[in-house]
């Protein structure tokens, strides 16, 4: 009887561990800092980082090809959005002309400069795409309002959205270009971006492809180095924002909030918060899309209840993470310091 009980307990623990989230480290072949990652499928993913660097895998991460965009050695690519093994966009940050968007359609063999900011005061933080043709990118405030550009032709042209459609920024308000995920999109026209700074941490939302915006305050911590660093939405109503203070990596107070009404109102996560400052949050794109993963320099956390509570898994630090649907399961990667790349292990949960 005792033996049978022990076997049953062991089997249960094995089953639980088999579905538990985790990261499997993969050699990237570089020691640069990665800030962007984009999961395409179980086999294909892209990453981006400093010194004009990008990386790509087409074999599930067993090998990574690392390259440098010609003429971009001084640029820091904080965001990458990829659609397949051939097609990807890179966004670099910085004031004025350092803010750029490049595109490849041949797996990185060549890159086309699609956008270079002509505004000296602009500082682009991140971009997102609804589909292959329609995308959006946001900059810190220029003349008192956040600057947004959109494309409807696969990046061949990028146009500023109407200034009058953007609410005024608060004093000291800005975005955080930490992971390429302070802006996100959903459906065909919905978009959100998170902010921080000395006056508050807010989420801006648009339902018309970025032409007009509304804004809501959140309970996320704010300050000179604090605010919302990442937003993710499961659908048009349910979303999560994470952040904190990047100078206080272990501080978890007021580092996450959830919305159930499309970003009109935000509720602080209770005591079971992510375990420290978090630079990225993403839905694990498996069956049901009910699981979330958040990453930061002190480790990773997961939620199986739409962000209401969190559990830690692993102390290895990452800056960014990305997941995609693949054959009904979940495929994902995380990336960070010194060329660190890891593939997600574990089953998606409802």
What are these regions (language model features)?
Residues 16-350:
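Residue-level hotspots at or immediately adjacent to binding/recognition sites across diverse folds
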Residues 4-13:
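Sec-dependent N-terminal signal peptides
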């Amino acid at each position: 009887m005792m033996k049978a009980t022990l076997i049953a307990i062991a089997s249960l623990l094995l089953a639980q561990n088999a579905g538990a989230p985790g990261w499997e480290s993969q050699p990237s072949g570089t020691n640069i800092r990665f800030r962007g990652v984009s999961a395409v499928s179980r086999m294909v993913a892209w990453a981006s980082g400093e010194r004009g660097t990008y990386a790509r895998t087409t074999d599930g991460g067993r090998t990574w090809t690392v390259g440098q965009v010609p003429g971009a050695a001084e640029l820091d690519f904080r965001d990458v959005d990829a659609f397949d093994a051939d097609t990807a966009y890179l966004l670099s940050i910085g004031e004025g002309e350092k803010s750029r968007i490049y595109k490849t359609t041949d797996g990185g063999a060549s890159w086309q400069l699609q956008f270079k900011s002509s505004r000296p005061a602009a500082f682009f933080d991140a971009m997102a795409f609804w589909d292959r043709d329609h995308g959006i990118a946001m900059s810190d405030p220029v003349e008192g309002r956040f600057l947004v550009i959109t494309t409807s032709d696969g990046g061949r042209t990028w146009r500023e959205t109407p200034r009058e459609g953007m609410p005024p920024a608060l004093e000291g308000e800005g975005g955080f270009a930490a992971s390429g995920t302070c802006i996100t999109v959903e459906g065909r026209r919905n978009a959100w971006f998170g902010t921080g700074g000395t006056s508050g941490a807010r989420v801006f939302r648009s339902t018309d492809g970025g032409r007009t915006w509304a804004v809501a305050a959140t309970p996320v911590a704010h300050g000179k180095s604090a605010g919302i660093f990442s937003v993710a939405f499961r659908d048009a109503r349910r979303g999560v924002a994470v952040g904190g203070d990047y100078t206080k990596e272990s501080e978890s107070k007021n580092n996450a909030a959830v919305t159930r009404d499309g970003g009109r109102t935000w509720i602080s996560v209770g005591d079971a918060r992510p375990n420290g400052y978090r630079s990225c949050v993403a839905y694990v794109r498996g069956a049901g899309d009910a699981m979330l993963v958040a990453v930061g320099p002190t480790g990773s956390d997961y939620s199986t209840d739409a962000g209401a509570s969190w559990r830690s898994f692993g102390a290895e630090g990452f800056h960014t993470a990305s997941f995609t649907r693949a054959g009904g399961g979940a495929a994902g990667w995380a990336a960070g310091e010194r060329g660190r790349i890891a593939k997600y292990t574990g089953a998606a949960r409802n």
